[in-house]
Regions:
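ATP-binding/phosphotransfer module of carbohydrate and carboxylate kinases, centering on a glycine-rich
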Residues: 3-6, 28-33, 78-185
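Phosphate-binding/catalytic loop of phosphoryl-transfer enzymes
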Residues: 1-91
Length: 185
C-alpha cells in the first residue's frame, strides 16, 4: 500500500510512484513520440508524445480488463469448454479437448480447477491455445476477438495520438504479430 511504501521509503525528499511501463517508456523516449504495447498475462499500452505527456491504455487487470491477454484467452477457453460440457458448443473442437486435458474431465475436478483459477493460472492456458496448429471455430473466434482489441489499441495510438513508433512486448505479442493488420505494424 502507499502508506507502507511511504513508511519504508521515507528517507527520500520526494517519492513518485509509477508503473513499470511508464518508467520503461520514459527511459526509452527521446524527443519523439513513442509507445509500448505489452501483451502477456494482461494487455497494457503506454505512450508518450514529444511533449512528454503520457497515457496508459488497458491494463485494468484480471478480471475486468486486459482483453486479448493470456488470462483472457484462458478464460475464453474455459467458457467454451463449459458450454461444450453443457451440450451447446462443439465438444469435438480441439480447444475443448486440450482444455479438458488440463482442467479435468469430471465435474468435481473441473469445479476444483476453476475455483482455484487466477490470472496466471488462466494465462498458462494461452500457451496451449497458441500451440494449436489445426485451427478450429473456437480458436478462430477467440483469436478474432483478441486481435480486434489489440488493433483498437494500436489504431487509437497511431491515428488519434499520432504515435509512430510502437514497441510490441510481452510473451504473447509474438503470436499476435502474424495476425495484426499490416497498417498497424
Amino acid at each position: 500500500s502507499r502508506r507502507y511504501l511511504n513508511k519504508k521509503l521515507n528517507f527520500f525528499k520526494k517519492l513518485i510512484i509509477s508503473t513499470d511501463g511508464y518508467i520503461a517508456l520514459a527511459g526509452a523516449s527521446t524527443s519523439k513520440s513513442i509507445g509500448v504495447l505489452n501483451i502477456g498475462t494482461g494487455v497494457v499500452a503506454h505512450f508518450m508524445n514529444k511533449n512528454k505527456i503520457s497515457q496508459q491504455l488497458s491494463g485494468w487487470g484480471f478480471p475486468y480488463g486486459d482483453k486479448g491477454g493470456g488470462w483472457w484467452i484462458g478464460l475464453k477457453m474455459i467458457q467454451a469448454t463449459l458450454r461444450a460440457i453443457d451440450g451447446y458448443n462443439n465438444n469435438g473442437d480441439i480447444i475443448i479437448k486440450k482444455t479438458l486435458n488440463i482442467i479435468g474431465k469430471k465435474d468435481l475436478k473441473i469445479l476444483n480447477w476453476i475455483s482455484k483459477s487466477e490470472s496466471r493460472k488462466l494465462a498458462k492456458l494461452s500457451k496451449v491455445f497458441f500451440s494449436v496448429k489445426s485451427k478450429s471455430f473456437i480458436h478462430n473466434s477467440i483469436l478474432k476477438e483478441g486481435i480486434y482489441e489489440i488493433e483498437m489499441i494500436l489504431k487509437y495510438m497511431i491515428e488519434e495520438k499520432k504515435i509512430r513508433k510502437i514497441f510490441l512486448l510481452g510473451s504473447i505479442s509474438k503470436f499476435y504479430i502474424n495476425y495484426i493488420k499490416k497498417k498497424y505494424l
